[in-house]
């Protein structure tokens, strides 16, 4: 049996529907309960049904909230608990859960990928390497191969865009800002970027690095190609990818080579892209890839919809992920979601058990710090490297585990992504800071191995403590496989409070049920 919302996200005042798949069983009844945090907000009973049914659970006039859905199904003498979650927002851009698609042959048209991403509450989907060429995104050919030789059906791409829209998911076209093919470069050699030896920058002898400066014809050509992706294919926005290198280069547009700094050019490229695409789509989605956290300091405040960071060495420890999130929040003024694209090579190089442990720990760390993790995509797959098409497929069991983590994230959306929550982990605990004290276990506020990683965030009415168990983990490198953490019990925390406490609750995606339990 299965339970999931019909859409990845719902808008304020929209009817919320859940799909209950009874897997052909004859069911006497199902009791549906909807919770906001720990408060029961809706309940109904559905009697006598077989197979799939849609259950309407009402409309929610709220601007930003996550809800938990629990359904108890009675079939004969058996009672089965099913759980899912959904969120309601006044603007989808307030909560962006990023996933990916990369398979676009005719055979992939109905491969179940969109349906799976919907069950995982992925509401923004990057279409990786969907285009004909990086310098010529849209082709009229029905069947073509991309620059890496991958076969693509144009109709499959368009069908997936349509299907995503039906599920409340926004399709984002991958469009590298830097790359052109060799034939294009040879026609426009002065549009490229050059090193100090005045040789063109080229990546794997395929991609020529182009000049995105304000006065470069490449910038205008690129934005025109983005426009075609939206008008001809139906994409909702653009993923502006970069390579991360070079950071300085020479332009050959003038009479003599001129050194330019790309961190000074990229923000205006983002803003100009936003302004020009607004003419074809009133509110296009725009994501820029800060590869290795560069240049977040100059791009975070630009007119984009998230601060997106692709995480690479030397950002290699758990503490670095929290650092990236905190800095991105500061540079952006906390005005937009933060997404970490942190790919896990243990799914290629280590045992599946250790890889799954690494995935659960890393995602928990990112979510606990108020950001989103780009890892999942296609049909039950995860990313292990920067070339998305070489993803790793999960088993049904492992896919269900990561899906449950997503359910938990959405159910407690208010506690993870409230913009008013401040991270006080490093200032309110340890040494002579008595606001928070752990009296029973070794804890770390920056993700040390063999300790409980405790992140503390608070606002005027809530104090949130997020525990990630690193006990039994031999190191704190996020991109290495991990042994199964050793369960910890009887944790005692002392918290200083300034007013009467209304309630203390604990919840976890690892138990039998996700409903928060009161702590006496």
Q: Where are the regions that the model predicts?
A:
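Beta-strand-enriched, solvent-exposed domains that form extended recognition/catalytic surfaces
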Residues: 1-91
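An acidic-aromatic substrate-binding cleft motif
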Residues: 81-133
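Carbohydrate-binding surface patches
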Residues: 438-499
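Aromatic/acidic polysaccharide-binding cleft in carbohydrate-active enzymes
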Residues: 242, 335-427
């Amino acid at each position: 049996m299965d339970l999931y919302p019909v859409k990845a996200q719902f808008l304020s005042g929209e009817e919320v529907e859940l799909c209950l798949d009874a897997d052909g069983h004859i069911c006497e009844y199902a009791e549906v309960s909807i919770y906001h945090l720990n408060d029961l907000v809706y309940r109904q009973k559905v009697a006598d049904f077989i197979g799939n049914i849609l259950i309407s659970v009402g409309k929610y006039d709220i601007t930003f909230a996550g809800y938990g859905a629990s359904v108890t199904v009675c079939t004969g003498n058996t009672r089965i608990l099913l759980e899912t979650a959904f969120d309601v927002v006044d603007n989808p851009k307030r909560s962006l859960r990023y996933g990916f698609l990369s398979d676009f042959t005719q055979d992939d048209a109905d491969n179940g990928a969109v349906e799976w991403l919907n069950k995982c509450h992925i509401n923004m989907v990057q279409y990786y390497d969907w285009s004909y060429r990086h310098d010529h995104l849209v082709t009229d050919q029905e069947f073509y191969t991309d620059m890496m030789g991958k076969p693509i059906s144009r109709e499959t791409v368009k069908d997936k865009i349509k299907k995503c829209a039906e599920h409340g998911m926004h399709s984002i076209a991958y469009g590298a800002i830097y790359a052109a093919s060799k034939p294009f470069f040879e026609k426009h050699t002065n549009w490229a970027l050059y090193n100090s030896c005045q040789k063109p920058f080229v990546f794997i002898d395929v991609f020529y690095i182009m000049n995105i400066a304000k006065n470069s014809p490449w910038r205008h050509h690129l934005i025109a190609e983005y426009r075609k992706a939206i008008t001809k294919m139906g994409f909702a926005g653009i993923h502006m990818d970069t390579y991360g290198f070079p950071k300085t280069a020479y332009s050959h547009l003038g009479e003599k080579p001129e050194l330019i700094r790309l961190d000074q050019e990229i923000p205006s490229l983002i803003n100009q892209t936003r302004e020009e695409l607004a003419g074809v789509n009133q509110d296009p989605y725009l994501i820029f890839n800060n590869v290795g956290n560069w240049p977040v300091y100059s791009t975070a405040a630009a007119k984009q919809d998230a601060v997106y960071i692709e995480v690479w060495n030397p950002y290699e420890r758990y503490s670095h992920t929290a650092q990236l999130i905190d800095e991105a929040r500061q540079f952006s003024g906390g005005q937009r979601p933060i997404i970490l694209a942190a790919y896990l090579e243990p799914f290629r190089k280590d045992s599946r058990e250790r890889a799954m442990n690494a995935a659960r720990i890393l995602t928990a760390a990112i979510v606990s710090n108020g950001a989103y993790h780009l890892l999942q995509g296609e049909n039950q797959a995860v990313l292990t490297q920067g070339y998305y098409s070489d993803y790793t497929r999960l088993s049904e069991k492992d896919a269900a585990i990561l899906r449950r983590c997503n359910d938990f994230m959405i159910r407690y959306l208010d506690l993870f992504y409230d913009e008013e929550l401040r991270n006080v982990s490093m200032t309110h605990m340890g040494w002579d800071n008595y606001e928070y004290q752990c009296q029973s276990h070794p804890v770390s506020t920056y993700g040390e191995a063999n300790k409980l990683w405790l992140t503390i965030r608070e606002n005027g009415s809530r104090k949130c403590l997020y525990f990630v168990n690193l006990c039994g983990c031999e190191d704190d490198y996020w991109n290495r496989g991990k042994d199964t953490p050793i369960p910890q019990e009887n944790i005692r925390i002392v918290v200083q409070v300034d007013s009467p406490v209304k309630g203390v609750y604990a919840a976890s995606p690892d138990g039998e049920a996700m409903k928060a339990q009161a702590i006496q």
